[in-house]
Amino acid sequence: MDLLSDIEKQLQKATAQAFLIALSGGLDSTVLLSLFAKLCQKQPHLQILSLRAIHIHHGLSPNADSWAKHCQDLCDQFQIPLIIERVQVDKTNGIEAGAREARYQAIKKHLQTQEMLVTAHHLNDQTETFFLALKRGSGLQGLGAMQQQSVLFGMQILRPLLGFTRPQLEDYAQKEKLNWITDESNKDNRFDRNFLRNEILPELRARWAYFDLAVQRSAQHCFEQQQLINDLLSEAFAEHCQIKNQFKLCQFRKYSLAKQTALLRMWLAENQLEMPSKRQLTQLINDVVFAKEEANPQFQLVNKIIRRYQDRLYLTKPFSDLTKYCLKLEQNTLSLPDDLGNLSVQENEHNLIFHWQDFSVTLEKTDLPISIRFGYSGKVKHHPKRPREDIKKIWQELGVPPWERNRIPLIFYGNELKSAVGFFRVFDEY
């Protein structure tokens, strides 16, 4: 089957009718753009309601500006709207990883609701991805490599060229007289993917003509086996993960290590996090899951923190220390630190009504200065019929995790605590 007919059949089964093409300007994405431009001419048969392209300008090559211009000229030729997005690449974890992260985050910013991202990954890319996963010691999920349709970083992705080899794309490009750019970094074998592409895989293909197809079959077997494991564990997973960013530990410690790691991987995948290594998962289980009952353990995984409280794991972002903040409330709205949103106040004849997120509290008016603080130690009277109690005990009764307690806005009249917004107000003693 030829490229055009195959992609046409794929689009008839696709779950979207609006598409955003990832366009680098290289051979693969240029062929992809040409194919979609041709398919658009078959309207209304395919019902492609929207077609756009996006080019990510990484700024890593001296030729980056000319590549962006080439992509613009190409899209003008095909009459397809193009977005050019410049990004800054964080090289902390390597250029390849940083560029990939920056690229997908930039694309996610522009991807519209009901729009599907289309990438030009082909069969040779699939082989490289499989070998890179093998090099990392990946399990079934990693060795499953890429699927024709999947979700990545919360985006629906279609890879319609996955069944075709690069030579097949080259044949199409030559017949259509397409022009494309060549990234000079593709020859740099310091990068793992280039080393495989330029040095290792050509030798294997020379010996075994159908090597890429065999790798694709193995990847598909791995993917299907992982799906089977997920299906078999789905009932247990639903019991442990009833809230997306929480994981109940009841009965969990009785499972085998293999079942524990599989369920935790499912939880992390549910939250769209990159898979940790086996060593990291074992450390998470030993240091957090099996930590002493009175401990408040935590484990950092990339840009997230896994914490434990009342026999549950919680997935949170790293939080700033807010205990030194003292914010004067001098207007009707106050912007709170560390992405906590705004606190606002309304006034009626006798009271002030404070609003924060979905919470509110009504307090009597005052002539004292009003401030918002975070974190408090000492005793408070939070119920009219109960004595003053240590605030730590109150937080425990309310089921507020330790890391959240210093993130709840506390309203002070002068130096007197009046309320923890959304949780309790302080009553006077008589």
Curated annotation (Swiss-Prot):
The protein's Enzyme Commission number: 6.3.4.19
Similarity comment: Belongs to the tRNA(Ile)-lysidine synthase family.
Keyword Transmembrane helix attributed: no
Name assigned to this protein: tRNA(Ile)-lysidine synthase
Listed GO CC annotations: cytoplasm
PANTHER family the record matches: TRNA(ILE)-LYSIDINE SYNTHASE-RELATED
Residues holding ATP: S24, G25, G26, L27, D28, S29
Entry note about domains: The N-terminal region contains the highly conserved SGGXDS motif, predicted to be a P-loop motif involved in ATP binding.
Pfam family, one: ATP_bind_3
Secretion signal span: none
HAMAP family: tRNA_Ile_lys_synt
Domain of life: Bacteria
Reported function: Ligates lysine onto the cytidine present at position 34 of the AUA codon-specific tRNA(Ile) that contains the anticodon CAU, in an ATP-dependent manner. Cytidine is converted to lysidine, thus changing the amino acid specificity of the tRNA from methionine to isoleucine.
Annotated GO biological process: tRNA modification
Gene Ontology MF: a single term: tRNA(Ile)-lysidine synthase activity
